[in-house]
């Protein structure tokens, strides 16, 4: 999109519609394309591809194998993966808990949910402001909101909990 905008005439142009049409008919893909294209290998991790896309503000990346184009990964692909990772299409209890980043703390948390009959559909950890802690986003089914809240409070500080 940016390449096409750069190649298009300015809106402030004095050219009439016919002159614009003529000029655009002479415009080729070669004149508008990005030549120094960032790519990823087919065996690269999805999170690394997402990081490259985010850092470079790219909407997509060509995927290569042995110097051959084998596909493309797009921001829409990453959104679909994000939805899948968070089990966004499944109803349940979703909680964000800040807990100690000590060995076994996540295991204790997930075991308590399981012992209460909960089925963990998704569990994602992210950095907290304090490096001694992690933010854990968990989504579980087959568990009551109040039961899940009690477990979350036993294991850390609840930032958010809700039925979704």
Describe each PLM feature range.
Residues 1, 40-41, 59-73:
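Cytosolic beta-strand hydrophobic patch enriched in CBS
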Residues 38, 59, 119, 157-158:
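Residue-level detector of anion-binding/catalytic polar loops
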Residues 121-124, 153-164:
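Conserved short beta-strand edge segments in small beta-sheet-based binding/regulatory domains
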């Amino acid at each position: 999109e940016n390449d096409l905008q750069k190649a298009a005439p300015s809106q402030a142009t004095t050219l009439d519609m016919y002159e614009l049409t003529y000029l655009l008919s002479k415009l080729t893909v070669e004149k508008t394309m990005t030549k120094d294209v960032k790519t990823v290998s087919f065996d690269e991790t999805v999170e690394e591809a997402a990081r490259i896309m985010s850092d470079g503000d790219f909407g997509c990346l060509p995927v290569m194998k042995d110097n051959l184009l084998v596909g493309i990964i797009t921001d829409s692909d990453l959104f679909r993966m994000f939805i899948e990772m968070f089990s966004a299409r499944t109803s349940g209890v979703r909680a964000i808990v800040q807990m100690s980043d000590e060995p076994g703390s996540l295991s204790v948390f997930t075991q308590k949910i399981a012992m209460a009959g909960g089925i963990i559909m998704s569990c994602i950890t992210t950095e907290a402001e304090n490096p001694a802690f992690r933010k854990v986003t968990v989504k579980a089914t087959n568990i009551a909101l109040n039961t899940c809240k009690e477990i979350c409070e036993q294991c850390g500080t609840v930032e958010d909990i809700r039925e979704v």
